[in-house]
Amino acid sequence: EDGSDAVSGEFLAEGGGVR
């Protein structure tokens, strides 16, 4: 997790998963 739920959500939407 990057620390921000919003960031994780964006990555998940892109298909990159949690970074």
From Swiss-Prot:
<keyword id="KW-1015">Disulfide bond</keyword>
<dbReference type="GO" id="GO:0007596">
    <property type="term" value="P:blood coagulation"/>
</dbReference>
<protein>
    <recommendedName>
        <fullName>Fibrinogen alpha chain</fullName>
    </recommendedName>
</protein>
<dbReference type="GO" id="GO:0002250">
    <property type="term" value="P:adaptive immune response"/>
</dbReference>
<comment type="function">
    <text>Cleaved by the protease thrombin to yield monomers which, together with fibrinogen beta (FGB) and fibrinogen gamma (FGG), polymerize to form an insoluble fibrin matrix. Fibrin has a major function in hemostasis as one of the primary components of blood clots. In addition, functions during the early stages of wound repair to stabilize the lesion and guide cell migration during re-epithelialization. Was originally thought to be essential for platelet aggregation, based on in vitro studies using anticoagulated blood.</text>
</comment>
<dbReference type="GO" id="GO:0045087">
    <property type="term" value="P:innate immune response"/>
</dbReference>
<keyword id="KW-0391">Immunity</keyword>
<keyword id="KW-1064">Adaptive immunity</keyword>
<dbReference type="GO" id="GO:0005576">
    <property type="term" value="C:extracellular region"/>
</dbReference>
<keyword id="KW-0356">Hemostasis</keyword>
<keyword id="KW-0094">Blood coagulation</keyword>
<keyword id="KW-0964">Secreted</keyword>
<keyword id="KW-0399">Innate immunity</keyword>
<keyword id="KW-0175">Coiled coil</keyword>
<comment type="subunit">
    <text>Heterohexamer; disulfide linked. Contains 2 sets of 3 non-identical chains (alpha, beta and gamma). The 2 heterotrimers are in head to head conformation with the N-termini in a small central domain.</text>
</comment>
